[in-house]
Amino acid sequence: MTQEIRTVAIVGCGVIGMGWAVLFLSRGLKVIISDPMEGAENALKGYFEQSRSYLEGFGDYDKLVSNYEFVHDIASRLAEADLIQENGPERLEFKRGLIATLDKYARPGVVIASSSSGLPSSEFIQQCKQDSTRVLIGHPFNPPHLIPLVEVVPHPGTSSESVNTALNFYRSVGKRPILLHHEVPGFVSNRLQAAINNEAYSLISRGIVSAEDLDAAVTSGPGLRWALTGPIATNALGGGGGPEGFSQRMERLGPAIRGWEDDILKHRFDWSEQRMSALQESVNKSLGAVKWDQLVEERDLVLLQLLAAKQKMASMSTPSGH
């Protein structure tokens, strides 16, 4: 598809769908959005109000949010969409039927991007009768309007034109897309999170560290560096910089890391009732007094400040800005 994308259909407006709506509206796009859940439309309006300060950073709030329609029959409106962002439940049979419906009613060539967080699109295109080559994964991180990352994951039959359309579109709305060259369950970032979380659960449930100190070990340590340069560049910097620095780091720390890996695998979190109970007990102590509304508000504020600071640095800015 070569035409400009001006209208996006959002199918499913849970937290992810609502975040996409805020992002697309902030960029002046028209949004047609639908969700069968009772109360979904009111929830969407409330989410827009919560995101008022973000939207006001891009223009007049009332003007921006007037550019969407909540509809109950999305199929009858799909022909108007230049791109479709699907956010249905992570249930395979449901996803297959939904994607087939989107494929049936979408205009030829219109990309159908799924926000699936772990199911590869090759698993839910079987019922597509029109054109499965335009289906791919466009997986965001929550909240989509704040965190730039989106993982673009084509299935083996996805056309290169559809991939390029998705990549260019996400860049145009301020996202930082990454392209996966092969499908893997969970994609990239969720696999990284799973590896870190599983080790975190193991350390906490074994009584080695509290949940509170585990979070501090990330937020006051490597998490700060990873947010700026990522694990690979951080390793290279630790070895003096450049590809040679990465190689030196691997040679110097490789034997020790392999030893840690043996211990990590030996004590990996087994999801047993005993381990789960110990983990939950520490989490209760750590998080019981947290004021969650305040935490979310402050998190989003600092996140925006961090993104703005990174954007000013040539080596850390996103290609299209955010």
UniProtKB/Swiss-Prot annotation:
One of its GO terms (biological process) is fatty acid metabolic process. The keyword Membrane applies. PANTHER family: 3-HYDROXYACYL-COA DEHYDROGENASE FAMILY PROTEIN, LAMBDA-CRYSTALLIN HOMOLOG. SUPFAM superfamilies: 6-phosphogluconate dehydrogenase C-terminal domain-like, NAD(P)-binding Rossmann-fold domains. It is an enzyme of class 1 (oxidoreductase). It is a single-pass membrane protein. Its EC number is 1.1.1.-. The keyword Cell inner membrane does not apply. The active site is at E151 (for hydroxyacyl-coenzyme a dehydrogenase activity). InterPro entries: 3-OHacyl-CoA_DH_NAD-bd, 3HC_DH_C, 6-PGluconate_DH-like_C_sf, 6PGD_dom2, NAD(P)-bd_dom_sf. This is 3-hydroxyacyl-CoA dehydrogenase FVEG_12628. Pfam families: 3HCDH, 3HCDH_N. It is found in: Membrane.
